[in-house]
Amino acid sequence: QEAIGPIETTNLAGVKVRPMNEDDMARIARDFAVSATYMQKAGFDGVLIHGGHGFLFTQFLSPLMNTRTDSYGGSLENRARFPLQILKAVREAVGPDFLVELRIDGTDHQPGGITPEETGAFVAMAEPYITSVHVTCGIYEASVKSGTESSMFHPHGLNIDNAAIIKKYTKLPVGAVGGINSPELCEQAIAEGKIDFAILGRQMLADPEFANKAKRGHEDQIRRCLRCYKCFPGSPEEGYDDLPFTSEELALYVGHCTINPLAHLPFDPDTLAPASKQETVLIVGGGAAGMQAAITACDRGQKVILAEQGPRLGGLLRFTDVDTDKPDLMNFKNLLVREVERRDIDVRLNTVITPENITSFGADGVIFATGSLPSCPPVPGIGHAHKAMDMYDGKVKPGHKIVMVGGGLVGCEAGLFLQKTGHEVTVVELLGRLANESFGMYREALIWEMEKCGMAMLPKTRCLEITPTGVKVENAGGVQTLEADTVLFALGMKSVDIAPLKAAAEAAGLKTWVIGDAIQPGKVDQATRSAYLAGIEVGR
């Protein structure tokens, strides 16, 4: 079928779009109405019509997208004519008592595009046909930069203020969606009269019990969405050509969650048989993986000893106590600590597990959650540099001008933190792409934030030598020396060697599991998922 739209154009995929005529509009309005009646006959209470994100309604309402010169373009009344035709057809088809909700952009964040004032005026026109309004923002082709799917670098509740403007134009209930992950923000926005209700999307994957926990006063037990895009990283349709899977594989990937290991499991956790017996399990390592494994095993009736060699739980996630871009990840780390503390888990801090004492805890099995450490490759002059992670806990006091050797996720995120706190950072990366182990929307959000902050980025650049005053590098422009007050390196991570511990445990007949970075260095989602799967195995 040919593509049609408000105007003649060529879309991102190179497909020519024909401008719609009135016959097209009548057919599409009728299709909307028929679809709504199908939902009504199927027993649903209502439908939500998505009019935002650069879809059909936005294409007509936006003065930037709709440049028609007939009665469907120009003034707001003209641009609203076809969207109102659709809503009117739907309402007439389903009758007065069926819910018809409308999701609409408060702004598309495009110069010359939609404004909250115009959206408010449109909502006033649509009042006879709809029952409530969802305020969102942005366009599909620029999901990250326009806030359609907000990142951790966007403010929470980024559409609430625009919803408050739109609310002035209508008596209908107005809600906001986007970046809302706390009951406190919901309550505040409603109490201030900015919205009538809050809408949660990704947050309900992070914690489906959000509303129930808030109702019971257990806000501190809510797993709050990180906006990390694990659940949906983007798609080829949106122009992401760096996704490490096909469209078919993407369909299987969607719905996973970094902080909720139960999301998208290949089985229903509610159907798990109870543990056949109670066992004692020793968990070595108190990072994210170790804590999640302890929580899961304890909840299944097992006796848990959680041994952490340091004075605090948290592992590598303790860097979030400092990094101002990671408040939600810090909240998750703190939640895991609280969840461990409120359970009957025997926590042993400042406890080093050795091959000699691993059998002295009376455990039936051992879960190794020993994590990873920064790699220190043989770069000439590496002794003049410091590990990037060391600056988070005060081991390093960086100077003003910093060169970060290694532009993977750790190097980029640590460099971004330093840039935002007043330092001048240059990131040097051998590969042609920074943050190469990331992809899709998160990588776009990270690189965009780095660009906005003025970080210098040198991909396809080899580090030849680190000196007391800088870094000697080589790229297509030749050899040069980058001056630096401090040189940091983030050149990968390596798993802590657990071979002697594992051998000692297995020699004594103990069951063993390896989870998280102890398997191989990875991300938080790999830690929580492997931890949950190990935790449910204890006692089986």
What are these regions (language model features)?
Residues 175, 346-350, 386, 456-458, ...:
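General small-molecule cofactor/ligand-binding pocket signal
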